[in-house]
């Protein structure tokens, strides 16, 4: 091989490697552009997935709260009616306490009273317990001095019965308390 041929061969090799370098630079630039687009697409997909999961959790919470509210409404549906009936029940008790009623009238009033009490019990309305004074269930309208026979915070007299619907207080019992 002559020097001329060798120079041409080297020149051809250099020319052959130059386009490869340019092509590889273009390929690398293309790959980084594709990688960048892919990364952005993955970030958007992750963002959408997070938004979907949050929306799904929010819908479940809304459904749970709606169910709880519906159950509460069903459980306490008779609250207003019970509050309206309680004064009538008090009046029946006062009427039964009146002296001079005939036995027939007294028996009729007792039957009406019992039927009202039974209807209220079926709806979950019960009298407030009267063992010891509880400020959550009783309203102290008067106090008396405590002694050996009557310890502090015991109930001396009930002026008006209290009622509760399940665990919700409808009306506190008005009581006289030893203090």
From Swiss-Prot:
Chain positions covered by the region annotation Disordered: 1-40
Main location: cytoplasm
Keyword Cytoplasm: yes
GO molecular function, one term: adenyl-nucleotide exchange factor activity
Location relative to the cell: Cytoplasm
GO BP terms in the entry: protein folding
Keyword Cytoplasm set for record: yes
Compositional bias annotation for Acidic residues: 15-32
Any matching Pfam family: GrpE
Gene3D superfamilies to which the protein is assigned, alphabetical: 3.90.20.20, Head domain of nucleotide exchange factor GrpE
Name the record gives this protein: Protein GrpE
